[in-house]
């Protein structure tokens, strides 16, 4: 099997082991290596088999640490490191992880003698050599922002609309958005106090974004001025250092943190401890070589209910050769340009689900609470889609609402976002790559919407006209603030006991273009309970 190293059987050190020698399998677990990434010397990720419980895992953790501590070679091990991340990576067991019970394991820095024993333990499924991951931004260039405008228009941008983003002002409300990256400048004014520091994974690192990459992605996802879902709550999960690099094992731990936080929030909402919670999304604009562990972690997170967007990568190569881009259940995002081309650096291939703006993207930055920067990469494309995930999740009734509908699962929303995206708009798309782009915010033809979403309770349907933007269709609040925009005529599926009534007072109608006044007929139960796609 490619990537598996054949190692000879070494003497077992069992003094500290809670298992007997004869309980060790003769067949060793494989050691996987990424062929396209820089490995972290003597650092490993160990994944348990499915039968392993938290109790068994805890006993194993103690066992492996005792074995490591008994090795006289650990002093020499510290001298051999080439990675330069500090002494914490030489202390044996580093991180443990349990992602919704679907992926349990640990990471650490071990001598090969220890790893040889670990791989023959009956509870171990596979071991992966830890490797470097990094951010995915490209060159910095000056240009006008355009990404938000592009995702809210079906057709190519023109001089009249290249800087106009049409959206629901409450998009993202009730949604937690996790930025698994270099951190977030949580005090930036564009976040309006909605950004919180979640967790710093790299040991002995500080709780701040010393790079800017994570802050930029967060601004695109949920900033007031630069963001798609302008009311989402942001959480910083720092897995990369200020250099923009880190380890695969730390990224896995970051995924675990986001998944656990989501599960807890959802449980609290179900028990009435939290009001108005709609769901959680995560963005990972980072990548490295092929990693089964990271892909398994992301897929487990999606299964646990966390909506995931990941960057396809900037290698102008097949995204299936990189992780987390190859994670099957996440939405993998390539980068497009203002001219509706595949960005020259963007990865492609069957693992790329959709393209979004990724060239010359203006967003929030570090250095001050007002700083901005323009950078490029699939790193910039992915948070556009993560923002859309938050946007659409927020437009569902919360689980504590009297009008709650069936849960919008990550699998369903991924399918729906791809289904309503623009097909065939981009050039320079390889034949094995889906030509799907932008996932425009609320741009639907009547037959698209009724065919794709008619089965969902409470779905908005469009009885006539093909709009060029979401405009007020996705606005769940009373419409005076949006009355000057183009508004669709829509209807809403509601209980028989609820009577529809107009959302728009006559004063709002009078401010609308005459060509649209006759089309403005919206039904509602309560504004916070309308469901839109």
UniProtKB/Swiss-Prot annotation:
Residues 1-16 form the signal peptide. SUPFAM superfamilies: Protease propeptides/inhibitors, Subtilisin-like. Its EC number is 3.4.21.-. InterPro entries: PCSK9_ProteinaseK-like, Peptidase_S8/S53_dom, Peptidase_S8/S53_dom_sf, Peptidase_S8_His-AS, Peptidase_S8_Ser-AS, Peptidase_S8_subtilisin-like, Peptidase_S8_subtilisin-rel, S8pro/Inhibitor_I9. The active site is at residues 181, 213, 379. GO terms for biological process: proteolysis. This is Subtilisin-like serine protease pepC. The lineage of its organism: Eukaryota, Fungi, Dikarya, Ascomycota, Pezizomycotina. Residues 496-519 are annotated as: Disordered. It holds the Pfam family Inhibitor_I9. PANTHER family: CEREVISIN-RELATED, PEPTIDASE S8. Residues 145-450 form the Peptidase S8 domain. Belongs to the peptidase S8 family. Residues 496-513 have a biased composition (Polar residues). It is an enzyme of class 3 (hydrolase). Residues 43-136 form the Inhibitor I9 domain. Keywords: Disulfide bond, Glycoprotein, Hydrolase, Protease, Serine protease, Signal, Zymogen. GO terms for molecular function: serine-type endopeptidase activity. Glycans are attached at residues 283, 435. Disulfide bonds join 320-351.
């Amino acid at each position: 099997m490619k990537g598996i190293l054949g190692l000879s059987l070494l003497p077992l050190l069992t003094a500290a082991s809670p298992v007997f020698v004869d309980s060790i399998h003769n067949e060793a677990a494989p050691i996987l290596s990424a062929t396209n990434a820089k490995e972290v010397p003597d650092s490993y990720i160990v994944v348990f088999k499915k039968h392993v419980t938290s109790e068994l895992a805890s006993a194993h953790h103690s066992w492996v640490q005792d074995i490591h501590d008994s090795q006289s070679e650990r002093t020499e091990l510290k001298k051999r490191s080439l990675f330069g991340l500090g002494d914490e990576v030489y202390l044996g067991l580093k991180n443990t992880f349990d992602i919704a019970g679907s992926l349990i394991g640990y990471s650490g820095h071990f001598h090969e003698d220890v790893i040889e024993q670990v791989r023959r333990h009956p509870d171990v499924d596979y071991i992966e050599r830890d490797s470097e991951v990094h951010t995915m931004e490209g060159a910095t260039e000056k240009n006008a922002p355009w990404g938000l405008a592009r995702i809210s228009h079906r057709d190519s941008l023109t001089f009249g609309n290249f800087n106009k983003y049409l959206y629901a002002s409450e998009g993202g409300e009730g949604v937690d958005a996790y930025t698994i990256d270099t951190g977030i400048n949580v005090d930036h004014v564009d976040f309006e106090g909605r950004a919180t520091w979640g967790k710093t994974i790299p040991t002995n690192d500080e709780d701040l974004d010393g790079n800017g990459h994570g802050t930029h992605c967060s601004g695109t996802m949920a900033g007031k001025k630069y963001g798609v879902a302008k009311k989402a709550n942001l959480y910083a999960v720092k897995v990369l250092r200020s250099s923009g690099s880190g380890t695969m094992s730390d990224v896995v731990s970051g995924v675990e943190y986001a998944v656990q936080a989501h599960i807890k929030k959802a449980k609290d909402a179900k028990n009435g401890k939290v009001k108005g919670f709609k769901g959680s999304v995560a963005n990972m604009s980072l990548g490295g070589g092929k990693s089964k562990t990271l892909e398994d972690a992301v897929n487990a997170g999606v299964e646990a209910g966390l909506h995931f967007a990941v960057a396809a990568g900037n290698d102008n190569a097949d995204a299936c050769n990189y992780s987390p881009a190859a994670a099957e259940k996440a939405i993998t995002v390539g980068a497009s340009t203002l001219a509706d081309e595949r960005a020259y650096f963007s990865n492609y291939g069957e693992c790329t689900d959709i393209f979004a703006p990724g060239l010359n993207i203006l967003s929030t930055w570090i250095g001050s609470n007002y700083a901005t920067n323009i950078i490029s990469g699939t790193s910039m494309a992915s948070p556009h889609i993560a923002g859309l995930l938050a946007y659409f999740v927020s437009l569902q009734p919360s689980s504590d609402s009297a009008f709650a509908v069936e849960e919008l699962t990550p699998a369903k929303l991924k399918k729906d976002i791809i289904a309503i995206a623009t097909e065939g708009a981009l050039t320079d798309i390889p034949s094995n790559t889906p030509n799907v782009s932008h996932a425009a915010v609320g741009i639907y033809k009547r037959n698209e919407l009724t065919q794709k979403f008619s089965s969902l309770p409470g779905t908005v349907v469009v009885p006539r006209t093909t709009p060029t933007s979401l405009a007020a269709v996705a606005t769940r609040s009373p419409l005076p603030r949006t009355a000057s925009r183009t508004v669709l005529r829509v209807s809403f599926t509601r209980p028989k006991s609820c009577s529809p009534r107009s959302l728009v007072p006559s004063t709002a109608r009078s401010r609308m273009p005459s060509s649209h006044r006759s089309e403005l007929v919206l039904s509602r139960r309560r504004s916070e309970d309308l469901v839109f796609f």
